[in-house]
């Protein structure tokens, strides 16, 4: 029901102060009161009802009000506290609605909380004064409140007014219930007695639905942003000003939201969760079963004047060995340094304090000829079945005498193997192979994956700054089918006469833009066939917040290498 605007203060004052005018004959809401009285068996007293008819003449004399800038701000459903129009949003005392002493609690400050504004409750009365209005005789002494006008145009009017308990009008009854449990939010009051009576009470609106008008812009704004955004901003400002004590803090339902998609699009609780999952995936071979197995003999190695890396591996060193003991033992071959194996694949210059040595260590010589001299001093068996010579060197520590340790060098030629030199290498058909055994060179890796999937044209072993293997490699195929078969296999177990090792196969990653937004770098790759593309952080969370995609594991390039 729409009501006209009144300009003359005397007219408004007469509306409320004149107690001698006829009661119901000229009331603008007379028809509704009569229907309510009929439902209540004619038990209402209309002697105190305001006698203001609808004056359409005055309304017609205000054609320019809606077009003025002042009107725009005054008709905003949720005006800011800093900018209050001279006309403002019509309050209960400025409208002749046919109800004497009408006042909506919380209307003038819709974002006040229950606990932060106890003084306002004493100043603002309920819609129907229990001492002066006809409904008070029947409905008891509990003040009533009407539902607020929802900016989204929802169906809140279908719900009954939850005010029989005397609570303030909560303008966010669904977004932020202050009940301690869902059971406390059951509707009561009119709806429990008569739905028809509730509909009549709800029809007593104090103003027509107000359109969403821009306060400063030229064009219309999005209703969803206007309604929800302004609510959130004003609510936060009101709560910050009130700052209730912890003892008076209201109870809330835990973690509920009407728009769960907003939570999914927001920032994750752990901003580094993707990086952590990517690091965990690099060790996935240790906890996953192999999907296929290769067993056989590695191809023989025939070297002519090999060139070695200056770095060698020592396995089976005495547990009480020290860096000084290692340097004193091997400095006869040349100047060297010691790298102790550390956590996360790092090699610190000395063993961690309080930790026992891992049983192996790396020696880094300054010159390649020092490695040659070391190998000549080792005992080895050149007639091994796979053609791989095993070198052993005898050393001693304070508590162990003549301990034989294994020396594993690396020939630089073993780092790369090209099966077809004329074949162009396509990075999009290249896989990354992790968790490689130290005895596996590029030629052997190419032979194994070619036996399993076919189409191998190149294999390479990743090395560090000393050109020593770091336990991973790359294999390129000449067709998409072989490439996808290798990626799908994911985990392959390799069995030889010398070792058994499970390796991990993933797509080879390059620097790429996000293939969703095409505006941000895409450091995260999803290897699942449903996605199989690069993502930025925001697009990853957006895509993988969907049901059925949350189990996908991200891949990242190892920036250290």
UniProtKB/Swiss-Prot annotation:
Zn(2+) 1 binds at residues 514, 517, 536, 539. Zn(2+) 2 binds at residues 526, 531, 544, 552. The modification Phosphothreonine is found at residue 171. Sequence-specific RNA-binding protein that regulates mRNA cytoplasmic polyadenylation and translation initiation during oocyte maturation, early development and at postsynapse sites of neurons. Binds to the cytoplasmic polyadenylation element (CPE), an uridine-rich sequence element (consensus sequence 5'-UUUUUAU-3') within the 3'-UTR of mRNAs. In absence of phosphorylation and in association with TACC3 is also involved as a repressor of translation of CPE-containing mRNA; a repression that is relieved by phosphorylation or degradation. Residues 158-194 are annotated as: Disordered. Its main location: cytoplasm. It comes from Rattus norvegicus (Rat). GO terms for biological process: cellular response to amino acid stimulus; cellular response to hypoxia; cellular response to insulin stimulus; cellular response to lipopolysaccharide; mRNA processing; mRNA transport; negative regulation of cell population proliferation; negative regulation of cytoplasmic translation. The record marks 410 as: Important for the positionning of RRM1 relative to RRM2. Residues 329-561 are annotated as: Necessary for stress granule assembly and correct localization in dcp1 bodies. Keywords: Activator, Cytoplasm, Membrane, Metal-binding, mRNA processing, Phosphoprotein, Repeat, Repressor, Ribonucleoprotein, RNA-binding, Synapse, Translation regulation, Zinc. Phosphorylated on serine/threonine residues by AURKA within positions 165 and 196. Phosphorylation and dephosphorylation on Thr-171 regulates cytoplasmic polyadenylation and translation of CPE-containing mRNAs. Phosphorylation on Thr-171 by AURKA and CAMK2A activates CPEB1. Phosphorylation on Thr-171 may be promoted by APLP1. Phosphorylation increases binding to RNA. Gene3D superfamilies: 3.30.70.330, Cytoplasmic polyadenylation element-binding protein, ZZ domain. Residues 310-407, 429-510 form the RRM domain. Interacts with kinesin, dynein, APLP1, APLP2, TENT2/GLD2 and APP. Both phosphorylated and non phosphorylated forms interact with APLP1. Interacts with TENT4B; the interaction is required for TENT4B-mediated translational control. Expressed in hippocampus and cerebral cortex (at protein level). Expressed in hippocampus (dentate gyrus and CA1-CA4 regions), cerebellum (Purkinje cells), cortex, visual cortex (layers 1 and 2), mesencephalon, diencephalon and brain stem. It comes from the Eukaryota. This is Cytoplasmic polyadenylation element-binding protein 1. The lineage of its organism: Eukaryota, Metazoa, Chordata, Craniata, Vertebrata. The 2 RRM domains and the C-terminal region mediate interaction with CPE-containing RNA. The interdomain linker (411-429) acts as a hinge to fix the relative orientation of the 2 RRMs. The ZZ domain (509-566) coordinates 2 Zn ions and is probably implicated in mediating interactions with other proteins in addition to increasing the affinity of the RRMs for the CPEs. A continuous hydrophobic interface is formed between the 2 RRM. One of its GO terms (cellular component) is postsynaptic density.
